[in-house]
Swiss-Prot record:
Cellular component annotations (GO), alphabetically ordered: plasma membrane
Traits of the deletion mutant: No effect on sulfate uptake, due to the redundancy with SLT2 and SULTR2. Slt1 and slt2, as well as slt1 and sultr2 double mutants show a 50% decline in uptake while the slt1, slt2 and sultr2 triple mutant exhibits no increase in sulfate uptake capacity when deprived of sulfur.
UniProt keyword Transmembrane helix present: yes
Function: Na(+)/sulfate cotransporter with a probable high-affinity for sulfate and a proteasome dependent turnover.
Induction cue: Up-regulated by sulfur deprivation.
Annotated GO biological process: potassium ion transport
GO molecular function: monoatomic cation transmembrane transporter activity; sulfate transmembrane transporter activity; symporter activity
Annotated family: Belongs to the divalent anion:Na+ symporter (DASS) superfamily. Na+/sulfate symporter (TC 2.A.47.4) family.
Stored Pfam families: CitMHS, TrkA_C
Gene behind this protein: SLT1
The protein, known as: Sodium/sulfate cotransporter 1
Keywords tagged on the record: Cell membrane, Membrane, Repeat, Stress response, Sulfate transport, Symport, Transmembrane, Transmembrane helix, Transport
Subcellular location: Cell membrane
Boundaries of every RCK C-terminal domain copy: 212-296, 318-402, 407-492, 498-584
């Protein structure tokens, strides 16, 4: 075959450079592809004409993608899906059943709705549900993204990629004799996509024990931390072995400090008391979560030292919860080899004076025995977690000379925090449940302060056994994101809801705004009630944030100060109208803060269902009654008319970066096809097919090439670039156009290893605080597994009925596997556990080591119990100051 022309060389060279730019994340794919396309059209039409380059912007598949965002926004704004999913999820204590309950409904849902909004509204639901059920969040969020992707492969409208390929195929074969064979109906991909999704689901269920991460952090692990037992904690007066603390993974109690003595844990029968300081080895995220569940407060080194003093500020003052958070802003630092702190104990260092920092935890090891944080002798390479004070400056010379590199931010406890009250409705599901069981503990950015009864009495937040009653008012410290979560929580309404309703603003145009009070403005020194805020501004103050303080007053009684940040419920135009108001120095709308229009929930769901039914009926009768593009537009228009969403929300729902990426990628693929580059790559696939003696091998090659490209680019771009290559190869090998397109659809959705390869991956990556390594540990074997699955499906595509039957039977068996497992003899269970432990040791050695340590600790505690120990601790040495 002739060599590439200069046009082909230019096209492939600059396309490859664009791939490098996108893979390195230097510039986004929307800008990269748009600039690349403009460059390729600059050669007077010799590479690609302007008409062909612009054709993608009006492609019907792309237009369908764009306007389905409108429909998804309409459903999301009604809150209907959240209500349904909360009901479907129910309650589960095991990771296996939690995954079954969470993944399967999402797979079904994402088959008919765009997976991005599905994941958007499911993330806070799953976080709350996981905390409520005691299931690690990290076990749920990666499977959530994968479930949304897998479900999208079951119908032609399930993902934007599918719609893009459908649009490209319609355009390519519009005037061909194969037009009928090429026309996609909604379920034409189902014979391949459903088994593909089921086997992906099976893999996650089988691998969750040794591949999915638990509650872990991206930062230092195996830390020595201190927590204080609050007087009202559920563990007070309980033996350590009966408290539930020993059963918590990643939370290992090593010692107790009580009455001036450090007691090493040699006997789990020791009885815990209020005020005890427990020394724990584990990870910060896990310790914080367990602390919230059991009533334990994180202790820094200054509080640890204060607890030694019998008089002074007083224990309750030291551990009071009046501060805005248990810490201000945590940073991680590594002690340099040249540090003058080496050889000194933590207590001997003037941390605040020299660095503006307070030690919170130190990584264990360096040959030291576990003890108190203050008594740890510092060594080179020690990793510390430190809380920042107002005097902290990362550019201090002392910090640069004593620590390696830059101090890394770990957690921000100083994000704007508002004290907000929510009232419990009589019919709320949370009635009769503890705060934890109701799903209000462990939510990022949310902390329950107290509960007020209707009779005027109050319950402190540390009463972990209290069960919520109708008409209770729950006072919560929450950041802006958590306030949005509360506004959509079923059965709860804001205490200020009456004031909000009196503004007269329709719920359709209501949202939240943050406004900072001017130091010289007319609001300073007055209460919200005094200034008649609602009357003057036609808006209601929902909550107030004050730097470094929680204001224990109702909103209308707070005396405002300069710098206070008001959280205001108002009309969508309010921020623009008051941006230059002298009362405020900054006015900023809160994104996605519109309350759910629950009264329109049924209308929104019915309209979306009707849209899907038009496609299903058309597919069953092999007749297109209405194209999905105008159908989506009309559905969204009806949602607008019926008040499911407003016009601004409709406009903002469209993800223009996705539109630009896909449209420009169409033009680039046209350039690759027109210059012969696509044919060159297609010939390689044709050779594979002929060499392997069948079309199945060619389809597998198409799938693998698209999947690998999807890890580097966005899924839509990968599909658009691969389509002309695959279509040429398919036509040459006499493969039906639908089979070729299905291979691309499945491959383009297979971005599982890289968290940046797929939008839903990126969303759960941030929400779950995963590391790239954790994603790759799950995603790499998952990718290989699905390559094998896709190979079988594509090779045996003509026997899809048998593939379906086998897939469903195997899936049912795996779902019921835990029940079958416990019917096996113990010796067989031990062998099975050992087999999976060996696999885990190879794939994730650190996690396997931690599990073995945990098991040894539990066995050790059990043996101690059986020895008949009295429960009295051995005499412990006094702490040497």
């Amino acid at each position: 075959m002739a060599a590439l022309s200069w046009q082909g060389i230019v096209a492939v060279t600059f396309t490859a450079l664009a791939f490098v730019v996108m893979a390195a994340d230097w510039v986004g794919p929307d800008i990269t592809f748009t600039v690349l396309l403009a460059f390729l059209t600059a050669f007077d039409g010799q590479i690609v004409t302007v008409a062909k380059a612009a054709a993608g912007y009006g492609n019907t598949g792309l237009l369908t993608v764009v306007f389905l965002y409108w429909v998804a926004e309409g459903i999301t704004q009604t809150g209907g899906l959240e209500l349904i999913m909360n009901y479907v999820l129910g309650r589960s204590r095991s990771v296996h059943w939690a995954l079954v309950r969470s993944m399967f409904p999402v797979m079904v849902l994402s088959a008919f709705l765009n997976n991005t909004p599905c994941v958007t509204f499911m993330i806070p639901i799953l976080i709350s549900w996981g905390r409520r059920c005691g299931v690690p969040i990290k076990k749920l969020l990666i499977p959530l993204s994968y479930a949304a992707v897998l479900g999208g492969t079951c119908t032609s409208i399930g993902t934007s990629t599918n719609l893009v390929i459908v649009g490209l195929q319609d355009a390519r074969y519009a005037k061909s004799k194969q037009v009928d064979q090429a026309k996609f109906q909604i379920f034409d991909i189902a014979p391949y996509g459903v088994p593909y999704a089921l086997w992906g689901f099976v893999f996650i269920l089988l691998a969750q024990g040794f591949l999915l991460p638990g509650n872990s952090s991206r930062y230092a692990k195996d830390l020595l931390l201190a927590v204080r037992v609050l007087p009202s904690s559920s563990v007070v007066k309980k033996k350590l072995k009966d408290s539930g603390l020993l059963q918590q993974n990643g939370f290992d109690v090593t010692a107790i400090y009580r009455n001036g003595q450090l007691i090493k844990i040699s006997d789990p029968s020791i009885v815990l008391d209020g005020g005890d300081i427990l020394y724990v080895s584990g990870e910060l995220d896990v310790v914080e979560f367990v602390g919230e569940e059991y009533g334990l407060a994180l202790v820094n080194q200054e509080q640890e030292l204060a607890a030694e003093r019998p008089f002074g500020s007083g224990e309750e003052a030291v551990f009071s919860a009046n501060g805005a958070a248990p810490y201000h802003k945590l940073v991680q630092a590594k002690l340099s080899k040249t540090s003058d702190l080496i050889g000194r104990t933590v207590r001997e260092v003037s941390w605040q004076g020299r660095f503006g920092l307070i030690p919170v935890a130190i990584q264990r090891g360096n040959g030291r025995e576990d003890g108190r944080l203050s008594d740890v002798v510092l060594a080179a390479g020690d990793v510390l977690l430190l809380d920042t004070t107002p005097f902290y400056d990362e550019d201090r010379e002392d910090i640069k000379t004593n620590f390696d590199g830059k101090l890394h931010a770990v957690k921000d406890g100083a994000a704007k925090e508002f004290v907000i009250g929510v009232k419990v409705k009589k019919s709320a599901e949370v009635v009769g449940k503890t705060v934890s069981a109701a799903g209000l503990r462990g939510i990022p950015g949310l902390f329950v302060l107290s509960v007020d009864h209707a009779d005027g009495t109050s319950v402190d937040s540390s009463d972990y056994l209290y069960k919520i009653q109708p008409d209770d008012t729950i006072w919560i410290a929450a950041d802006v994101a958590a306030v949005g979560f509360l506004s959509k929580f079923p059965g709860l309404e804001l205490v200020q809801q009456e004031q909000v309703d009196k503004t007269g603003t329709s719920i359709l145009y209501r949202h939240l705004v943050q406004a900072a009070v001017s130091h010289k403005g007319p609001l300073v020194g007055k209460t919200v009630r005094d200034v008649r805020f609602r009357t003057l501004y036609n808006a209601a103050v929902v909550a107030v944030h004050r730097e470094n303080a929680r204001i224990p007053l109702k909103v209308q009684d707070i005396v405002l100060q300069g710098g206070d940040v008001l959280l205001i419920s108002c009309h969508t135009n309010w921020a623009d109208e008051h941006r230059h108001d002298k009362s405020f120095v900054l006015v900023q709308p809160v994104p996605d803060s519109s309350p759910p229009k629950r009264s329109r929930m049924i209308i929104g769901v019915l309209l979306a269902t009707g849209m899907v039914l038009t496609q299903i009926i058309g597919g069953l009768k092999n007749k297109e009654y209405i194209h999905l593009w105008p159908c989506a537009v009309l559905t969204a228009a009806l949602m607008l008319l019926t008040g499911c969403m407003n016009a601004d929300q409709t406009r903002k729902a469209i993800m223009w970066d996705v539109y630009l990426t896909i449209a420009a990628a169409f033009g680039v693929s046209a350039a690759l096809e027109g210059t012969g580059v696509a044919a060159k790559f297609a010939n390689a696939i044709i050779s594979i097919g002929k060499g392997a003696g069948g079309t199945g091998a060619a389809l597998i090659a198409i799938y693998i090439a698209t999947a690998l490209l999807s890890e580097l680019l966005t899924n839509n771009a990968a599909g658009a670039i691969m389509y002309p290559i695959a279509a040429i190869a398919g036509d040459a090998l006499k493969i039906t156009p639908k089979d070729t397109s299905v291979a691309i659809m499945l491959g383009a959705s297979a971005g599982f290893v890289n968290p940046f390869s797929y939008q839903t991956n990126l969303m759960v990556y941030a929400a779950g605080n995963y590391s790239v390594r954790e994603f790759a540990i799950v995603g790499a074997p998952f990718q290989v597994w699905l390559m094998i699955v896709a190979g079988f499906i594509l090779v045996y595509r003509n026997q899809w009925h048998q593939v379906w039957i086998v897939s469903w039977i195997c899936t049912a068996g795996i779902v019921l596997l835990p029940a079958l497992y416990f019917l096996l003899p113990t010796r067989i269970q031990i062998k099975i556990d050992g087999f999976f432990e060996r696999i885990a040791a190879v794939l994730n050695p650190k996690a396997a080591l931690e599990r073995r340590r945990s098991l040894r600790r539990q066995v050790s505690h059990t043996r101690t119990d059986d020895s008949g120990s009295s429960g009295s601790p051995l005499p412990a040495p006094k702490i040497v100051a």
